[in-house]
Amino acid sequence: MLESKYLCTYDLFSSIPTLDGAKTVTQEIFDWNKLMPTSSKCRLVRGGRRIEAPEYGLSEEDIQGLERVAMEPEAMIGNRSIADQFRPSFFETNFWLMWCTTFAFQPWHSAVEFKRYLLRFTHMVAGFNQLHGIMRTVYNQYDSMVRPLQKWLAEREVQFELDVRVTDLALGEDVSKKRVDRISYKRRGVPDEIKVGKNDYVIVTLGSMTEASSLGSRDSAPVLNGKTDGGAWTLWEKIAAGRAELGHPCAFTDRVDQSKWTSFTATLRDPSFFRLVRDFTGNVPGEGGLITLADSAWLASIVLPHQPHFIGQPEDVEVFWGYGLHVDKPGDFVKKPMSACTGREILTEILGQLQITKEAAQILKTSICIPCMMPFITSQFLTRDKGDRPQVVPLGTANLAFTGQFCELPDDVVFTVEYSIRSAATAVYSLFGLDRVPPAVYKGQYDPRVLFKAFKTLHEMTV
């Protein structure tokens, strides 16, 4: 998802043309969302009925808990979880149901990160139950954002090396500072190295929340991989060994049961599903956003984006996406954990939750549903201690910087493209000594109008 206060994202893409060169990516995003603003008429489905604008259902004690977490310093919260901050009934409210499925939080995740989200998105509390303010790209983000940026870079002779895995960084001493002087890597399995010159800089994307992901198929379930089934985590472990200033990857890699979930993409050649969901929800594809199936044992949610979702998508094909947060619980219609289900079984469960029975056989026959198991997809949300995430430019290094979801940036929130772009901008401006800083994080909590709207909304929807 995107929203209007992703200032680093829009700053970067304000100079990147779309693939057709008609306008900048930033302008395209704002133009598109002006044309089709998100306004859900079916944020939750419960008991076979759509709930258009669910009441938050918070008690005064719950609201006081939110206010306390929002105001408590991060140092005092420490490595405690969200569950440590609230009574169990909080996690039965519509507010939590919508918050956790929109952002993929679990009760055992970091209370510090939850606090950051509360502050970062204070301006979205009013209207959150209809997803007001959430923005989308015209196509999927790869076609709408990654490809234009890659094209712009390639035109400026940036080289992209594929099928290459960096295995180690050799850190030497240079005037009392650590300096990367060699990069070890494997290209198609063959070891090699790059010598780093005195005027060279090394910027590393640290860790990966999509590392070791695996795909299933229509008739097979994805496997659950681990941190050694890829290079991102092993690289971080190697360079951080004995160097506390480079962080502690084990804080994010060693609790897969707390960081995994399953997503799926369904490709449909029969228009029945989209027609039925459109008629049921009252939203056209691309308008409503996330639909959470509140009764689902898997806590499954789906999104029907505007079609076509991919550049070059055939006219007779429609695509939607979904995911589940409780992937180890048996389904309500398919008595298997979501993590053990094939694509056909996942789609069968979704059809059952939506009470689509008459057309189910035809939809299943003409669809391909691909499940994806992502063991580390919410690893950036896991409880952490100070120092587990290194600084963008680690203390005592001369030519090294980190980017991505696992370096430390004050105030901003992970699991966003904004965090990645902010870290990259911080790395470049710092390493090269540029007289620039990234746009400041928007802090709506200091705007009295924003606070009043949020306060009013929360208290109007109490139980």
Predicted region positions:
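Glycine-rich FAD cofactor-binding loop and adjacent beta-loop-alpha segment at the N-terminus
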Residues: 1-21, 26
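Short beta-strand to alpha-helix junction loop
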Residues: 1-6, 131-154, 160-165, 336-339, ...
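Amphipathic alpha-helical segments that form well-ordered structural scaffolds
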Residues: 8-15, 98, 144-155, 345-353, ...
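Rossmann-like flavin
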Residues: 19-123, 135-136
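Catalytic cores of nucleotide-enabled group-transfer and carboxylate-activating enzymes in metabolic
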Residues: 114-127, 150, 161-165, 170
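C-terminal segments that line or cap access tunnels to active or ligand-binding sites in enzymes
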Residues: 122-137, 195, 199-201, 206-422, ...
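A conserved short coil-to-beta-strand element within the FAD-binding core of flavoproteins
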Residues: 162-182, 186-189
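Active-site-proximal substrate-binding core of FAD-dependent oxidoreductases
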Residues: 430-463
